């Protein structure tokens, strides 16, 4: 079945990889310390879907891992623009700012991450209470 083909075999047979396959390839390459190739794979995933959150997260982390903090910050900002309620995106961007010495920016984004975390926790507590009351 064509859906069962590995990404490399699919390419050899002329089929384009999906964004998920490019993302998975990027993860494998990053695990092998092939950062340039991982970056290229994530960029191919993002060419198909510029707001693909998993690829944006991964690309930002690869850039940060090789001290390309300007690039990590730019991708982190793109991720937040695409997913403004993403707590992890805010936390990561705060870390990138901090590592670059941009403390005021790090604190501002970090505060937003904490606020999003509190909102998530409140919503989880509300849902737990609702589930409990429905059982009774």
Residue ranges and their predicted role:
Residues 31-43, 66-78, 100-112, 117:
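Structural signature of tandem alpha-helical TPR/SEL1-like repeats
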Residues 2, 9-19, 95-136:
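Terminal, low-structured helical/coil segments at or just beyond the last alpha-helical repeat
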Residues 18-48:
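Alpha-helical segment of the N-proximal tetratricopeptide repeat
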């Amino acid at each position: 079945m064509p859906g069962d083909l590995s990404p490399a075999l699919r390419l050899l047979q002329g089929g384009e990889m999906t964004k998920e396959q490019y993302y998975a390839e990027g993860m494998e390459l990053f695990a092998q310390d092939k950062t340039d190739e991982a970056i290229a794979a994530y960029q191919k995933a993002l060419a198909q879907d510029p707001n693909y959150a998993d690829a944006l997260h991964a690309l930002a982390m690869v850039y940060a891992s090789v001290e390309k903090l300007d690039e990590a910050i730019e991708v982190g900002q793109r991720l937040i623009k695409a997913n403004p309620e993403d707590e992890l995106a805010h936390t990561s961007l705060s870390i990138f700012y901090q590592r670059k010495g941009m403390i005021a920016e790090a604190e501002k984004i970090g505060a937003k991450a904490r606020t999003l975390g509190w909102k998530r926790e409140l919503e989880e507590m509300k849902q737990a209470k609702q589930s409990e009351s429905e059982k009774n």
